[in-house]
Amino acid sequence: MKKTVVVFLMLGGMALPGRSVAQTFAHGQSSAYEWPTDPAVRERLEAWQDLKFGMLIHWGLYSQLGIVESWSICSEEEDWIPRDSAVSYDAYKRAYWATIDAFKPERFDPSAWARAGKRAGMNYVVFTTKHHDGFALFDTRQSDFSIMHGAFKDDPRANAAKWVFDAFRREDYMVGAYFSKPDWHSPYYWWDRYATPSRRHNYSIEKNPWRWNQFKEFTFKQIEELMNGDYGRIDILWLDGGWVRPGRGASVDMPRIAAMARGYQPSILIVDRTVPGEFENYRTPERGIPAEREEDPWESCIPLGNDWGYVPTDVYKSPAEVIHILVEIVAKGGNLLLGIGPKPDGTLPEEVVARMEEIGKWLGANGEAIYNTRSLPVFRDADTWFTAAREGGKRYAIVCLDEGQPIPRQVSWKGNAPLPGGRLTCLQTGRTARWTRKGNVVTVTLPKGLPAGLPAVAFSWLPLEGRDQDR
């Protein structure tokens, strides 16, 4: 994944009308969507849509260095790619590869990660089995550039991906394997005969078909290692590096990969990011949120900090910011995959754990308005966002409150108004709230004793039978 300084990050702490984040994406979002035809895949997709909140874990050699993922070995000139200008590119790249001999996460405990995520209200995980640098966090037989051949090789937990997947399954997560299609360590992708001027393969596939076929086979076999049952049930195959695609002359033969994956893992969701078609079972806008409600399945992947992996100086979003982001995404019909970067020793930063605890406190009281919901045609009125239970017809209004400000005495919204005689329940307290309706405007008197700093207050009601309330 790519770090890009976008308007979303710049606006994170500002009080904006409606509190909607900017619609700027780090990668181009697919403009078309193709629904899966396999009923089992559709069923898995529906179950995934119920989960709403997941954890994306970036962890690897870049964590040891405390830098922005593996992008520093890409020679593109970008201000977000850090590299010591006093060191030649080739020398830097050699030093980066050598980090395999230093990465030794002796406090690695993925069960603690899973418990922290569960306390935060997360229900699925996507773990980086291999980022663009090619360093595998699983026991691959296709390359020696893996955690099984570095400083951690003699530790019983060396097959990190297996430990992660097992730990998260024990906490009842849906489990996803992140896998980078580009591999900058592979001589079949970056051939050492030539310079490596960009993230893309550095030779002509047309002139060197054998070499690219070797890369396709290498990619197929690595994915097969993750899919063949050695790592248990995998619910999502999350493929990054969308510039490796047929439309850019770099096919890895996705039909063959998908057939193999579903042969081992029936009904697995396949997410070939930003490549529209049958192998992108849901879309993944990065670092942003679509401007409008979308009925196709989608997920915004957004880091808790500025970076995906661990950077010691990173600045993290507040719990209120994350909750506001989650509320907006769910009201528009999507899921939030929140990026978390463990430290090189294998522990989560204390600031991350503290924020996850606070997010979980709010979801513990108000999660009914988030989980197992779907979006409504009228999904928003200023700072109020609306959702509906997937079953049963219950409606929800979630009013996002100004961070750092006293809780108001009353809140109001237009649209999705309960009809006279309906009961409105404040989810935070579980009690009936006093409300009035004038025309299409609902005004609710907030109950006393709400926690200071509450980021949002949610209400539920049942529509009266046979009556339309969405006016």
Each predicted region: which residue ranges?
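Positively charged n-region of N-terminal signal peptides that target proteins for export
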Residues: M1-T4, G117
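Residue-level detector of intrinsically disordered/flexible regions characterized by low predicted structural confidence
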Residues: T4-V5, G333
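Intrinsically disordered, low-complexity segments enriched in glycine/proline and serine/threonine
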Residues: V5-V6, D133
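Bacterial N-terminal signal peptides
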Residues: V6-A15
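Sec/Tat signal peptide C-region and signal peptidase I cleavage site
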Residues: L16-V21
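Mature catalytic domains of secreted/periplasmic carbohydrate-active enzymes
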Residues: Q23-R471
